[in-house]
């Protein structure tokens, strides 16, 4: 009788196997090389040769989340959850559930949720469930994912808290039956938020198509707002964008959470750092590093008070946190 136990590709190495897009240069350095890692589903002692990284998993039901030589993405999401910050993990989840033209998606948010809820006791489960709360299917680009995070995440995670936003909603026009997909869509006010990539929207033909598309949508009562990269990188432009969206959606952005400041900076790091480490939670956020929404003045005073307590009493329980 053979004692051979099958091993399966694990963790970040499995992200490469499943070809999850736009990880390097966003949450990993552009030249990152993931080590070969495997998992074996057993609760028995195991010989681990020096040439391979082998993990064991004894959680009942985990063994069904495999396909071919690798763990499936719902299980991989749990395996890597503690390797990333909460913002990086949300971004990863959006990319895992991103749209693939002409093919089924790699994974869906519901599949991630079912796996995380089922595998009680798995490493990273609690953090994964927290991230899954903010995920949405069908992102078509890394910048769509990041724009979605800026607008959808709650204030305590650095976002605007526009909870209705969904990604790539299908819109079928009554007049002529034309079909469009909205990059980000708010159903209650028929608002289409389009991310204009400099790579794909700078040609005359693309600009002409965009204008025609906007005209068709606006003729049937939809409102279209275009967002460029500079509106995300420039704080004043971003504040003006949020004010415009706030008026159209009918939801006021009012900051009460002191964690807004460090987490907004974390989102900016995700946008600008290109896969290199996010700022330390122990580095103070200054006034010029965030947009001045309503409520920011009072909330920033609370943030500074918490920061000063941390500086004076560094050995006491952490009073200023960004989720690890």
PLM ranges: what are they?
Residues 1-123, 257-260, 264-324:
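Short gly/ser-rich loop at a beta-strand->alpha-helix junction or flexible surface loop bordering the NTP-binding
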């Amino acid at each position: 009788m053979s004692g051979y136990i099958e091993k399966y590709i694990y963790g970040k190495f499995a992200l490469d196997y499943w070809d999850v897009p736009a990880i390097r240069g966003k949450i990993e350095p552009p030249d990152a090389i993931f080590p070969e890692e495997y998992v074996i589903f057993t609760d028995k002692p195991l010989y681990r040769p020096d040439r391979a990284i082998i993990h064991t998993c004894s959680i009942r039901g985990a063994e069904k989340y495999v396909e071919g030589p690798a763990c499936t993405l719902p299980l991989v999401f749990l395996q890597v959850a503690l390797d990333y910050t909460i913002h990086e993990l949300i971004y990863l989840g959006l990319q895992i559930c991103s749209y693939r033209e002409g093919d089924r998606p790699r994974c869906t948010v519901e599949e991630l949720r079912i796996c995380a809820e089922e595998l009680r006791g798995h490493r990273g489960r609690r953090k994964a469930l927290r991230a899954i709360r903010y995920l949405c299917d069908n992102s078509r680009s890394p910048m769509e994912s990041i724009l979605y995070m800026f607008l959808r995440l709650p204030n305590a995670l650095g976002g605007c808290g526009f909870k209705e936003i969904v990604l790539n909603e299908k819109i079928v026009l009554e007049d002529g039956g034309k079909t469009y997909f909205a990059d980000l869509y708010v159903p209650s006010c028929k608002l289409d938020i389009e991310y204009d990539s400099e790579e794909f929207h700078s040609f005359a033909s693309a600009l002409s198509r965009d204008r025609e598309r906007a005209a068709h949508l606006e003729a049937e009562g939809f409102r279209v707002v275009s967002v460029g990269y500079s509106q995300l990188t420039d704080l004043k432009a971003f504040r003006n964008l949020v004010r415009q969206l706030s008026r159209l959606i009918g939801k006021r952005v009012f900051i009460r959470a002191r964690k807004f400041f460090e987490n907004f900076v974390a989102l900016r790091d995700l946008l600008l750092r290109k896969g290199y480490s996010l700022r330390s939670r122990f580095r103070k956020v200054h006034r010029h590093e965030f947009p001045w929404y309503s409520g920011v003045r009072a909330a920033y005073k609370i943030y500074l008070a918490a920061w000063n307590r941390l500086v004076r009493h560094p050995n006491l329980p952490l009073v200023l946190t960004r989720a690890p």
